[in-house]
Amino acid sequence: QRDLCGVLDEMRLVKDAHELALMRHAAQISARAHVRAMQHCAQALRAGQEVREYHLEAELLHEFRRYGAQAPAYNSIVAAGANACVLHYRADRAPVGSNDLVLIDAGCEYDGYASDITRTFPAGGRFSGAQRALYELVLTSQEAAVAATKAGARFNAPHDATVAVLAQGLLDLGLLDKNQHGSAQDVIERRAYFRFYMHRTGHWLGMDVHDCG
């Protein structure tokens, strides 16, 4: 008998045109769901209504099914305020304050293929100065990762690009002491950024949200 796992893993690693089309459609549905949740949050808070994390999760689920997705690709994460600092937060019960940042990590599954989107937004529709500074740093790091993602690039290239931007940004914002860390390279070598960014950047995606790779 031959173990087919290795063969199947190799088949799943490279997607054909049909698979890519399904993945793009799943991503489009998920993007609509994120926008719906953001809009509902700001509108409800401005109207003086209570908003809880599970209310935003319900908006996500509504949009997934509305556009034909069979299910969430994984348990959705909706984390308001300090809850967003908890990796893989699952409670989804806390109230959302108008001055909170809200992190949503959610994606749908469409015809067997997963999507995965994480976004952070100001619950009431406007950033404070400190929130905007952090958001723009993360956005710049994301743009660096996207620019580093290309055919023939090393798998680690997007992560390395992200960390380089974050390391310099943490120094510039004063979140890391320049007297202790003389340069962004020093921050990277000593992994001083790890307190704020302990994840990797990106993962394989396909029939599973963390697909074979």
Positions of the model-derived regions?
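Active-site neighborhoods and metal-handling regions in enzymes and metal-associated proteins
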Residues: Q1-G213
